[in-house]
Amino acid sequence: MAGEGRRAEAVREGWGVYVTPRAPIREGRGRLAPQNGGSSDAPAYRTSLSRQGRREVRFSDEPPEVYGDFEPLVDKERSPVGKRTRLEEFRSDSAKEEVRESAYYLRSRQRRQPRPQEAEEMKTRRTTRLQQQHSQQPPLQPSPVMTRRGLRDSHSSEEDEPSSPTDLSQTISKKTVRSIQEAPAESEDLVISLRRPPLRYPRSEATSVQQKVNFSEEGETEDDQDSSHSSVTTVKSRSRDSDESGDKTTRSSSQYIESFWQSSQSQNFTAHDKQPSVLSSGYQKTPQEWAPQTARMRTRMQTSSPGKSSIYGSFSDDDSILKSELGNQSPSTSSQQVTGQPQNASFVKRNWWWLLPLIAALASGSFWFFSTPEVETTAVQEFQNQMNQLKNKYQGQDEKLWKRSQTFLEKHLNSSHPRSQPAILLLTAARDAEEALRCLSEQIADAYSSFHSVRAIRIDGTDKATQDSDTVKLEVDQELSNGLKNGQNAAVVHRFESFPAGSTLIFYKYCDHENAAFKDVALVLTVLLEEETLGTSLGLKEVEEKVRDFLKVKFTNSNTPNSYNHMDPDKLNGLWSRISHLVLPVQPENALKRGICL
């Protein structure tokens, strides 16, 4: 018991209260150096001599007031001006009103000396305020709802916004606008000690001034508060009855529907008092002036540019209160919004001239896009008409001839631009159908190019059979190149088997599947077999094999040297694969006279 008493006394005295306990010392470890700043051998932390191996600090159960280090949290808090806030006693309503009245007159003191014009204006405002106090309007009832919104906004603006030497806080009374300025810390301590800590919320980087404005046709008070110079903003509106009570009542800002106006903090409202469009100016307005002013304000909000955010709505029962929010906009800017619509109209007119070339380009492109299929459709229709006429003239031909040839050439006409390869049609016949073969091949080629109103190119191999192979090759190349470059899109080559063997290699250039010189053209080749007649019972595959074997005999033999300009079996196979896209037989026509086509 004695040891415990000594430890309790040790705890109560001096700095031992603040010593932080440490872990116990193990057995066999040396004692620590003195911790009390002395050179004595006293054990550290004032431990008992009977228990040197383990230190223990017993914390007392007594309340913290015993140690003398307890202070109320309210005293430790500092006011915004760095002064201790003393505890306030509860006062009666009349005493509170006196304190607030004194706070009001303390706020009314400005930091700078007013100019003569401003001093005269302040006198006018004071005279008007005294007249308002003797008006016969009944006293306003205090609002049953006390919102924290005003206190929160004012406190956040106090901490976030730097002070400005310009007076921005103004209160719009029933017929006048009064300014509320910075108040000393003594008058603000009352509200600080009673109110709850406000909630902080992020604000935009651009420092703005929030003003609460109420417009009323019945002459109600309009509260306009600015919190850049004061830590707590208390908006009071008073009205006295000349016959009854002279007591002052304080109305909370939540009784009105608030309207926030954000303006630049460095803007001085006294410079805008001369502008009739600014509603927060300091001169007196009659009720007749408020009505057109409100109408002009609504007009500005409706004609404002799209960049400004405007929110309409929330009118009171008498439609006198307008709730709006304009972001980062000074009063001078809002007064210039009336001219926004003509400027936008001229801007649209200027941009309209820039749109004309674009519209013209789109129109021409769409015309080209839609006209090209129309041209192709017309070319196909013209080809179909020509083929139907030929079918009526040459009635001795097999139906396969008309169906296959028409489908093949129509597909080529309908193919997309540029076309991948030319259309190669090979017609063959026996000796009895030589005239029909000539006439029909020429007329089919002309039908393909009938839309262009040009005649197909005609090359006859019988006229070149005895000429040199290289010469024939050069002549054929020139005839085809010149004709196809000049707008002709079809060519007919008669008696392909009569050409010199080496000269036929030129058709690699015009009949290739991928690398043809002209791909939007049609070539019609004819081969006359040595047989007297060609049976109608033969299939297309058999007819194709007959033509292939016949050309192989005509163009290759054992005496032909192997060279690049002479035909050989390998070159013939390559040529055949290019000209044999479609091989069709032609039957003789009894009504056809020699040398005259139908």
UniProtKB/Swiss-Prot annotation:
Any Gene Ontology CC annotation: nuclear inner membrane
Membrane topology, record value: Single-pass membrane protein
Listed GO biological process terms: nuclear membrane organization; positive regulation of ATP-dependent activity; protein localization to nucleus
Classification via InterPro entries: LAP1C-like_C_sf, TOIP1/2, TOIP1/2_C, TOIP1/2_N
Polar residues bias locations: 205-214, 277-287, 300-313, 326-341
Residues modified as Phosphothreonine: 221
Crosslinked positions (Glycyl lysine isopeptide (Lys-Gly) (interchain with G-Cter in SUMO2)): 323
Keyword annotations of the record: Coiled coil, Glycoprotein, Isopeptide bond, Membrane, Nucleus, Phosphoprotein, Transmembrane, Transmembrane helix, Ubl conjugation
Protein's name in the database: Torsin-1A-interacting protein 1
Natural source organism: Pongo abelii (Sumatran orangutan)
Native organism taxonomy: Eukaryota, Metazoa, Chordata, Craniata, Vertebrata
